[in-house]
Amino acid sequence: MHRISLLLRKISTLLLFAYFSAGALTLGVAVYAIARLFIRDIRGRALFIRRCTSKGFRSINAAARLLRVYRVSLEGAVPSASEVRNTVIIANHPTLIDYMILTSLLPENTTCVVSGRLMSGFMRHIISHMLYISNDLPLEDWSSLISPEDAILIFPEGTRSSHHGWRIKFRRGASNLALRLGRDIIPLRIVC
């Protein structure tokens, strides 16, 4: 019975990965091309792409729940666009899908600080159209990329967390960022 369960789990995971890949291809080609052609305002285009990405990730989360690969449960309410306005949202990073889950839940006025390594290759086009910020950029250059309406999502641990405790060792960059930009901090904790 255990072998059958394991096989079903692997098949479900494979189906979810195929669904994710098809969605990424659709977003990466069709949605971004349409947005670039028809939405001239750069910020409006970024918000449209973020909204489409969020909806795509919501559908992946729903498929994952249906296939019993994973499920997302929340404690408390998802903050609204006005509640996250002009804040720095910090979160731990225990899995590869943290960004996907948070993006599906947070409002479209949330921009993300991404690793400079993601700014090379095909991902740089998607990231730049979403007006996400490379952590390689000096803070002085961020002001042209963010609006006071935006929340900034950052994973202060850097790469994925390797511990399961409540105490999380964040780097000081997120608090320094919030202080220098004069923004409040909203902490989020992801538990697997």
Task: Tell where the protein language model's regions lie, with residue ranges.
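Membrane-anchoring hydrophobic helices of lipid-metabolizing enzymes
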Residues: M1-T87
